[in-house]
Amino acid sequence: MRFDLEPPSSVAAAHRIGVLLINLGTPDAPTPRAVRRYLAEFLSDPRVVEIPQAVWQVLLRTLILPLRGRASAKKYAAVWMPEGSPLRVYTERQTDSVRHLLTSNGYHVMVDYAMRYGSPNISHALTQFKRAGVERVLLMPMYPQYSASTTATAFDAAFDALARMRNQPEVRTVRHYADHPAYIHALAEQVRQYWAQHGRPDFAAGDKLVLSFHGVPKRTLDLGDPYHDQCQQTGALLMAALGLSTTECRVTFQSRFGKAEWLQPYTAPTLREFGEAGVRRADVFCPGFTADCLETIEEIGMEVRDEFLAGGGKTFHRIPCLNGASAWIGALGEIVAENLQGWPVKAAQPEPVN
């Protein structure tokens, strides 16, 4: 095995600490070519699609990418921001905010972000850390709930990059924070602030709040993945924080792909059923997405909205994701700080002179 080239070891190295925020990824542009390139990497991950790769790659290259590339590009174009992809824009802002928060609290750490698929990739970010003298790294996935298809594959990519290093840094990982009080508080604050500006649903009249999480195949639950249970845990804690019952608030799962059974209830059919049942207002919030992206802006804000209205609903609200909310940045900083304990994150103080 060939190892990456590295500078000579030195006792005068920076011995710095790096915090790497890791998100899923996004195409570089809302074009069919860029989207196909992104989807090819994403859907080729055996953690994401757990069927024999020899069969899957034929289907992927001959049917799925040609069909989905152009259709998905149109959807990305509908949500693209002047600065770029929403997921990348919001993740960059979160990174800047966490860096500023830690620095203002006396932490001497580098903070950067990487994407599991697309750019900037995890290997590049870890290489940049090494070049800056980082010897300890905290991997912080932006997925509050653990899943093999998100958290585990992000760690896989990081460990693959480490396997190519001769002089490896010390590494810690944040597995999940689905029940972390600061995260739950940030979610509740996001909902409350939205309602303060746009009015609270009339739950007594039958209005609903839907908590929509990204779906995964049901068989992953049967195989031991804790994702479903952690989504339900987050949902229950958020309902309690908002003072809502399971009649007023429902946990659902979105973004089903293929014909296999996924975690249920599905988001879009649930919203249509609400409309058909006479529910006048439905608010949808996505607690598992820490930054707005195609799945929240387009799928929820457009497709799911249309399902609800087509079913007879009158008013639909998509509550924005945490993005750069101050409570969320504070929660991120708190979770990071907890996982940095024991590492020399602050400059040594000189001994007092007697």
From Swiss-Prot:
Name of the protein in its database record: Ferrochelatase
Pfam families the record matches: Ferrochelatase
Residues annotated as binding Fe cation: H214, E295
HAMAP family listed in its UniProt record: Ferrochelatase
EC number from the UniProt entry: 4.98.1.1
Keyword Cytoplasm: yes
Biological role: Catalyzes the ferrous insertion into protoporphyrin IX.
A GO CC annotation given for this chain: cytoplasm
The reaction(s) this protein catalyses: heme b + 2 H(+) = protoporphyrin IX + Fe(2+)
InterPro entries the UniProt entry points to: Ferrochelatase, Ferrochelatase_AS, Ferrochelatase_C, Ferrochelatase_N
Primary localisation category: cytoplasm
Group of enzyme by EC: lyase
Compartments it resides in: Cytoplasm
Pathway of action: Porphyrin-containing compound metabolism; protoheme biosynthesis; protoheme from protoporphyrin-IX: step 1/1
One Gene Ontology molecular-function label: ferrochelatase activity
Record's keyword terms, sorted: Cytoplasm, Heme biosynthesis, Iron, Lyase, Metal-binding, Porphyrin biosynthesis
SUPFAM superfamilies xrefs: Chelatase (SSF53800)
Family: Belongs to the ferrochelatase family.
UniProt entry tagged with the keyword Metal-binding: yes
